Amino acid sequence: MRKLRLIAYFVLLAAPAWAEVSEVRFPIGAGGVGFLPLLVMQKYGLIEQYAKQAGINVHVRWINIGGPSVMNDALLSGSADFMAAGPPSFLTLWDRTVTSVRVKSVAAMVSMPMYLNTRADRVKKFDDIGDRDRIAVTAIKVSIPSIAMQMYARQKFGPSDVYHYDKNTVTMTHPDGVIALLSGSGAVDAHFTSPPFHQRERKDPRVRTIFTTDDVMGGSSTFSMVSTTTKFHDQNPKVFDAVLKALEEANRRIVADKKTAAEILLASNGGEKGFSVSEIVDVLNDSHVKFTTTPEKVMKYATFMHSIGSIKNQPASWKDFFFPEIQGAPGS
């Protein structure tokens, strides 16, 4: 009996302090090209495959929610284990949780620009936007387009008028923004949008692009990224590693077979209704659309947002808000 007790004692010593999760809850994101890697991960069960290789049987429950505020709430409430959003939304959440659950990013997901399109005859360049012109964006003040326009406003008008264009913005989904712009109804004068909606608008010869996020970011920048809490990262190292490897493989699959990737996007709940496979393939072939886990210019967002008071904490480096597993990448 004493021998059995000793064996049990040493088995307990060798066992981990906790078992890793058997289920991962992952919001599918807002849909579209920027969240396509998640759809590929779901389609091929990539997280499950890599977890199994690590000796863990895990079920992934994909939650059909999108939009940064909803996903932020899901992560903070414990009803989701990961979230995917753009840099401004992520940085807002990172800043809020520095002294609590410490949300950090697993990796970037997609880099691509957003485009300010108009069909107004009088608007030939961004500086022609007047006080009464309405610009459709997905979210006022904290979306990528809103931050980009704040950056431009500071360059043009100085720090005292950084929110100059906020009064011009109205909230619309990308599909509604396309309809409003192309219809000429007067509901909006411009639409700040992303692929594939940008390409759809530019097929109309009356539509021109007057500004892009690349203009203020100085080149390619991260559009979407995956995040989780420090607690999940620390308590589930094998599952975390499986998620990162699954994301990297999803990006490789998209690059290698764009037609299949386009079909996956169009077949999903987040697919773009009214688009053809060939249209989506054209978008995926665009050199400005990059499927990469390497963060690009996320630190530039952080520095700017801190400078105008949108976040309170000033990171010293992009590595301050990414987990160590991705810090070997040439990020920024």
Regions found by a protein language model. Give the residues of each.
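Extracytoplasmic/secreted proteins, especially bacterial periplasmic and envelope-associated proteins
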Residues: 42, 46, 70, 74, ...
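Sec/Tat signal peptide C-region and signal peptidase I cleavage site
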Residues: 15-19
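Pocket-lining segment of extracytoplasmic ligand-binding domains
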Residues: 158, 163-170, 175-267
